[in-house]
């Protein structure tokens, strides 16, 4: 049997689905979950049983939306291969890479391309990329999204730790938000998140100068803690809330440390409808400042690990939903930068390495607090994937999503040892900690990429991820159709529409009718059915269907509400080299055509030069039969869908 036609099965007595733990059989085809059946359902002889487990818990693969991979340029700190290997061994199937501390930093389209070029052959798990917002780079934002495929942006309100990634001020943020608002409008309301390291400099500077005057001991953790007061976070978060409320674009507070800011975030979201979210990290939910040993700079990070009372309040915010994301903020460095011998918290590099250990770290603490195990899937899979617009493919176990799983034992414990860690720099404050929860298997798109006891992780099948719902420039990976079986099984109209949007531009009269005509035996039958539906529509609906297509010869920005396939078919990537007189001629002819017939001109272009379209359009203008012209345009639309189908299957 062709490997693409093989259906794999994962069976478990303890499967986390829709916030519950229950028995289930999960069917997988081409790396996608195509069905979820009862555990007792019969397995067909031709099916391949990948996992059958009675004791272990099966959850959707973890999504860590805050990881510093540091490649290219600082691969002695970390790199794609070591970071994704560590992720795989920890049940993490998707990671989102921060725009620093790589060199160059990812603040321009050119630098982004440099990062992308460093990725092939090194990804054990799937990876999405963030861009950076710094003073003066707002002109790069749209291109990094629409051509580069970043899934969000990160900026600092305080010095980032490296000079090439300067922090932003209010005017810089507003300038960037103006671009983000325009981008959101062009994408039909879909937005890309702006993430903020929320500390401001003034309280930190004042506290540090006071501590210096007092000759405070830099080896005492309390000295460092006092140098990063909560008020620095609180003021910064208030400012982000203010700007988010003003501009109403999606924002996110990374690594929230100060429990003082929780109430402001809660009120902004629940009282004012501000589209802001917040995350906290493994180390803030596990460590306490009181336990940090004298001079042990492995515990240093910014913002700092705070008091036990603060930790309890962070957990309360997690369980009540104010903080809905838990991430690693994996930020490694070489041991020399930690100044271990000097033990100087004030001068050592700030950052904690924990990518591989997230599930047991959080379960160790969550289990003590009575947090249901199934909630971990929301905190560590669903919410992070939603943050970066990948929840159509990533997150908890759901039909239509990638077949990504972590299979683990929540009752088994282990002691952290450097020999277990797969990151490049293995020094960690978790060394020697006894944690609850052991990962036994990690599955990526239906492929086993890690098993306990096998430290090789031989498969390199990770991919770079982009947001499929933001249709853009053709340097993106080609879009793909789900199997016809999966399409038939979709129960949500919106998901169905998103799929057939690759064949037909979004037009409700056609999409609604097709949804009601399921199941289809093949995509060819679906297209044939679409043609029959179109022929039966009234004139108004026919015009709505044909007007869903972009105009021939429009600029790249005007195609962005249409599908990415439409973008390629019209050769928009070559627009910059086209004679402007040709585009002007096409614009005039389009206007004449629409004025005469009352709908858009549609022709099967498929990459032909635009100058070859002009005589076709001129000839069609000579047609005086509106109905004949309308039917001709719709027939061309069907030919377009047939051509697309050949490319997509």
Swiss-Prot record:
PROSITE patterns per the UniProt record, alphabetical = DIHYDROOROTASE_1
> What are the record's GO terms for cellular component?
cytoplasm
Q: Which PANTHER family match?
A: ALLANTOINASE
Q: Give an example GO molecular function.
A: cobalt ion binding
Q: How is this protein named in the record?
A: Probable allantoinase 1
Keyword Metal-binding carried by entry: yes
What's the EC number here? Answer: 3.5.2.5
Q: How is it modified after translation?
A: Carboxylation allows a single lysine to coordinate two zinc ions.
Residues annotated as binding Zn(2+) 1: 66, 68, 154, 329
Q: Tell me how this protein assembles.
A: Homotetramer.
Taxonomically, which superkingdom?
Eukaryota
Pathway note: Nitrogen metabolism; (S)-allantoin degradation; allantoate from (S)-allantoin: step 1/1
Q: Which UniProt keywords apply?
A: Hydrolase, Metal-binding, Purine metabolism, Zinc
Locate the N6-carboxylysine modifications and list their residues: 154
Cofactor names: Zn(2+)
Keyword Lipid metabolism assigned: no
How the cofactor binds, per note?
Binds 2 Zn(2+) ions per subunit.
Q: Which organism encodes this protein? A: Dictyostelium discoideum (Social amoeba)
Family, per entry: Belongs to the metallo-dependent hydrolases superfamily. Allantoinase family.
Q: Name one GO biological process term.
A: allantoin catabolic process
Catalytic reaction list: (S)-allantoin + H2O = allantoate + H(+)
Name of a matching Pfam family: OHCU_decarbox
Q: Where does Zn(2+) 2 bind?
A: 154, 197, 255
């Amino acid at each position: 049997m062709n490997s693409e036609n093989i259906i794999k099965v994962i069976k478990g007595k303890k499967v986390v689905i829709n916030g519950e733990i229950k028995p289930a059989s999960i069917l997988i085809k081409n790396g996608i979950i195509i069905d979820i059946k009862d555990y007792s359902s019969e397995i067909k002889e031709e099916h391949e049983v990948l996992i059958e487990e009675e004791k272990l818990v099966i959850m959707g693969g973890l999504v860590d939306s805050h990881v510093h991979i540091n490649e290219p340029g600082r691969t002695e700190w970390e790199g794609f291969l070591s970071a994704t290997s560590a992720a795989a061994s920890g049940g993490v199937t998707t990671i989102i890479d921060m725009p620093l501390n790589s060199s160059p930093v990812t603040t321009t389209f050119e630098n982004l391309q440099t990062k992308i070029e460093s990725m092939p052959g090194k990804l054990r798990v799937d990876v999405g990329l963030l861009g950076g917002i710094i003073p003066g780079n707002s002109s790069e934002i749209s291109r990094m999204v629409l051509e580069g495929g970043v899934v969000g942006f990160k900026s600092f309100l305080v010095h980032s730790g490296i000079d090439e990634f300067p922090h932003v001020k209010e005017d810089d943020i507003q300038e960037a938000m103006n671009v983000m608002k325009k981008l959101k409008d062009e994408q039909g309301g879909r937005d890309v998140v702006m993430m903020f390291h929320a500390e401001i400099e003034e309280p930190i500077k004042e506290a540090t100068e006071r501590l210096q005057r007092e000759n405070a001991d830099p080896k005492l953790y309390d000295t460092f803690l006092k140098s990063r007061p909560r008020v620095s976070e609180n003021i910064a978060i208030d400012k982000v809330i203010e700007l988010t409320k003003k501009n109403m674009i999606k924002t996110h507070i990374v690594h929230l440390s100060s429990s003082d800011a929780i109430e402001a975030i809660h009120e902004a979201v629940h009282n004012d409808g501000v589209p802001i979210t917040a995350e906290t990290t493994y180390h803030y939910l596990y460590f306490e400042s009181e336990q940090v040993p004298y001079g042990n700079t492995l515990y240093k990070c910014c913002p700092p690990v705070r008091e036990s009372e603060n930790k309890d309040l962070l957990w309360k915010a997690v369980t009540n939903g104010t903080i809905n994301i838990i991430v690693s903020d994996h930020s490694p460095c070489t041991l020399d930068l930690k100044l271990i011998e000097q033990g100087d918290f004030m001068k050592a590099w700030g950052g904690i390495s924990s990518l591989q250990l997230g599930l047991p770290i959080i379960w160790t603490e969550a289990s003590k607090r009575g947090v249901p195990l199934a909630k971990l899937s929301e905190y560590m899979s669903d919410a992070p994937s939603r943050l970066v617009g990948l929840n159509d493919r990533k997150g908890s176990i759901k039909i239509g999503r990638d077949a990504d799983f972590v299979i683990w034992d929540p009752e088994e414990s282990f002691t952290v040892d450097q020999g277990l860690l797969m990151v490049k720099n293995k020094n960690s404050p978790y060394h020697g900690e006894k944690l609850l929860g052991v990962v036994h298997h990690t599955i990526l798109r239906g492929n086993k990429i890690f098993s306990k006891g096998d430290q090789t992780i031989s498969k390199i099948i990770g991919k770079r991820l982009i947001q499929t719902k933001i249709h853009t420039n053709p340097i993106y990976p080609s879009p793909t159709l789900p199997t016809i079986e999966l399409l038939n099984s979709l129960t949500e109209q919106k998901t169905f529409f998103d799929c057939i949007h690759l064949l037909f531009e979004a037009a409700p009269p056609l999409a609604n009718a097709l949804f009601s005509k399921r199941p289809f035996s093949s995509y060819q039958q679906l297209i044939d059915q679409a043609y029959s539906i179109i022929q039966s529509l009234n004139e108004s609906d026919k015009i709505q269907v044909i007007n869903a297509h972009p105009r021939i010869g429009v600029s790249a920005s005007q195609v962005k509400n249409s599908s990415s396939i439409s973008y390629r078919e019209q050769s928009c990537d070559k627009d910059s080299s086209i004679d402007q007189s040709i585009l002007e001629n096409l614009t005039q002819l389009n206007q004449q055509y629409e004025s005469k017939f009352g709908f858009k001109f549609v022709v099967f272009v498929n990459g032909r030069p635009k100058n070859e379209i002009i005589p076709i359009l001129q000839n069609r203008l000579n047609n005086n039969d509106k109905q004949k012209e309308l039917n001709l345009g719709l027939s061309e639309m069907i030919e377009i869908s047939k051509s697309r189908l050949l490319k997509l299957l």
